[in-house]
């Protein structure tokens, strides 16, 4: 699994845990829906740390909490 695939999997899991849709995440994170949908597509562009930070804020987790998961170890 690539780091991009792991990041997408983690965001997808956190969305499911919160019963949150990508459009709601976009609003909470201050991102456009197209940015979030593009981010969630593992075949699209690589994620920047700025986008990851905003997504973490939208999900209500710190960047440290986000990466503190087995898939990143």
Tell me what each language-model feature is.
Residues 1-20:
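A short, Lys/Arg-rich alpha-helix, primarily the initiator
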Residues 60-73:
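Short C-terminal boundary/hinge segments that cap the last helix of small helical domains
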């Amino acid at each position: 699994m690539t780091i991009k695939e792991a990041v997408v999997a983690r965001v997808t899991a956190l969305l499911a845990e919160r019963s949150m849709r990508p459009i709601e995440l976009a609003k909470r994170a201050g991102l456009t829906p197209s940015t979030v949908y593009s981010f969630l597509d593992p075949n699209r562009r690589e994620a920047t740390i700025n986008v990851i930070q905003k997504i973490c804020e939208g999900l209500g987790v710190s960047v440290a909490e986000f990466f503190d998961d087995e898939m990143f170890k």
